A protein has these predicted regions:
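Extended active-site neighborhood of metal-dependent phosphoesterases/phosphodiesterases
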Residues: 11-107, 111, 126-136, 140, ...
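Short acidic, glycine-rich surface-loop motifs adjacent to enzyme active sites
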Residues: 1-4, 106-127
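Short, active-site-adjacent cap segments at secondary-structure transitions
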Residues: 39, 120-121, 161-162
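Active-site neighborhood of phospho(di)ester-bond hydrolases with catalytic His/Asp-centered motifs
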Residues: 1-2, 6, 28-35, 80-81, ...
């Protein structure tokens, strides 16, 4: 999410898409709806996103973003719209009904969910005092993902670098078998959901790590901890 800073201005899309044409002409880009892609800072930015990406989407209200799914090989990807809620409301029933149906009918070996606002993050939107949306998403989605065996959740918004342990029902870490190959430690088919915050793709690194439950995380750092090429 947050494909561009100001989605209502075509100049931002040209800068992002045209300057990176060599990449985008060869590598598919499957975006989720971020707050900068819709009415925040952008007028009705959701319509601008539709003009620049061509996705097959289910029938839905798209005033504040969009949701969809696709399969690639043995992986089912489910792309959620977290602009569909506020600090005072849950994800709407229309999207939740679609989401549970997608999870029920999944036959692929792996299931990956992608969303903009995080459930678990050491940043201000996941662990700070104003993290009401993260707490709502956790209450609404965490057990659902564990129940249906979601393997990985990719999160944005906080610009941090973090990885949780595999989490089961009740947001509790589950036992995992680990194996080291060529000096790299792997979790072997863990029976829980791993939540990853993979940092910003641009230059907005964030440094402040907020108080969080260390028992849930394998790694939790500010994105300034990484060296960007």
């Amino acid at each position: 999410g947050d494909v561009v800073e100001w989605s209502r201005y075509e100049s931002y899309w040209r800068y992002m898409l045209d300057d990176n044409f060599g990449y985008f002409s060869k590598i598919p880009t499957m975006a989720v709806s971020g707050n900068h892609d819709t009415t925040y800072k952008s007028g009705d930015g959701s319509s601008e996103t539709f003009k620049h990406f061509n996705y097959a989407m289910p029938t839905q209200s798209t005033a504040y973003g969009f949701y969809y799914s696709y399969s690639y090989g043995d992986v089912k990807f489910i792309m959620i719209n977290t602009n569909d809620l506020t600090a005072a409301s849950d994800l709407k029933a229309e999207q939740m009904k679609w989401l549970e149906n997608e999870l029920k009918k999944t036959t692929e070996k792996w299931t990956i969910v992608s969303l903009h606002n995080p459930l678990y993050s050491p940043g201000k939107w996941g662990s700070g005092p104003n993290n009401a949306i993260a707490r709502q998403l956790t209450a609404q989605l965490s057990d659902l993902f564990a129940e249906y065996g979601v393997d990985l959740v990719l999160q944005g918004h906080d610009h941090m670098i973090s990885k949780t342990k595999p989490l089961g029902i009740g947001s509790l870490p589950v036992h995992e078998t680990k194996e080291t190959i060529d000096g790299v430690e792997y979790s072997v088919d863990p029976k829980g959901t791993i939540y990853v915050m993979n940092g910003p793709a641009g230059n907005q690194a964030r440094t402040e790590v907020y108080p969080h439950d260390d028992s849930l995380y394998d790694y939790a750092e500010g994105s300034d901890a990484c060296s960007w090429a």
